[in-house]
Amino acid sequence: MAKLHDFYKDNVVSDLQTQFGYTSVMQVPRIEKITLNMGVGEALADKKVLENAASDMAAISGQKPLITKARRSVAGFKIREGYPIGCKVTLRGSRMWEFFERLVTIAIPRVRDFRGLNAKSFDGRGNYSMGVREQIIFPEIDYDKVDKVRGLDITITTSAKTDEEGRALLSAFNFPFRK
């Protein structure tokens, strides 16, 4: 298992249990899954773009991404229902903890002009969503082999009931929220 998972079991659980007054260890919020999503609008014109995006996503996450398709036709965007328009990966278990560790310790500090993550990006149920403008912040991506710099969405799904609990959980891992 990843070091952050051991840190969670040894330190974070007891800290959150005393902070929020949980009676059982099972009430303590935990990270359930991390979802990475990359929308590739240019995939309509060139199929190679989606393949490159999928290979970048596979390198970042360590597992093969699912190609997402358009749910409905939109004439303004010139897409039809069923067209491939992006890719996504859902990480759970040990891969999730390894990715989370790389995100917090390596990738986020490599963001240019970084001033902290917005603490208001919680959804009301303790889940946190953030956007990354360039995939090259991850060490697995070779800058010279990238055809185009593209961003991705990262959603951290927790078992927290409120935003306050979710913020406390992520802050316990030194998640860099803006003050």
UniProtKB/Swiss-Prot annotation:
GO terms for cellular component: ribonucleoprotein complex; ribosome. GO terms for molecular function: rRNA binding; structural constituent of ribosome; tRNA binding. PROSITE patterns: RIBOSOMAL_L5 (PS00358). It comes from the Bacteria. Pfam families: Ribosomal_L5, Ribosomal_L5_C. Belongs to the universal ribosomal protein uL5 family. This is Large ribosomal subunit protein uL5. It comes from Psychromonas ingrahamii (strain DSM 17664 / CCUG 51855 / 37). The lineage of its organism: Bacteria, Pseudomonadati, Pseudomonadota, Gammaproteobacteria, Alteromonadales.
